[in-house]
Amino acid sequence: MRNIYFTDGSPEGFFTAVFDAYADKDAFVSSSKALQTALDDRFIAVSPVGEKAQRVVKKLRAVDKNSLCEIDFILRTPAADREQTAFDYIRLLVKQRRPVRGMLVRPEVRRAMELVDRVGAERHLL
């Protein structure tokens, strides 16, 4: 059984969901309206709360100030798993307490950097 933290798609809503879901081992964060779920999944609607979002942002700045830019890029992609990818990346970042962008052997980092590179490549096409 997964706990699906459903956000409104805003950055503040996402960071609030990260705050709420961080300790939940079965957490899945999404804003997709077309999410395929299992019968026993539990939905938790997350409304943006500025204080919770600011606490997450403050922690990320303390661990790795460049991670906020990377997370912004991840959340801008049209990928269906963008929120979960960013959440997994944040969870590893806070656990390691140091920048993790070079740990490409980890699947969550590899997927996050793939999405960051996609956005970077699209910017150059404009």
Residue ranges and their predicted role:
Residues 53-104:
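A basic- and aromatic-enriched beta-loop-alpha substructure that forms the phosphate/nucleotide-
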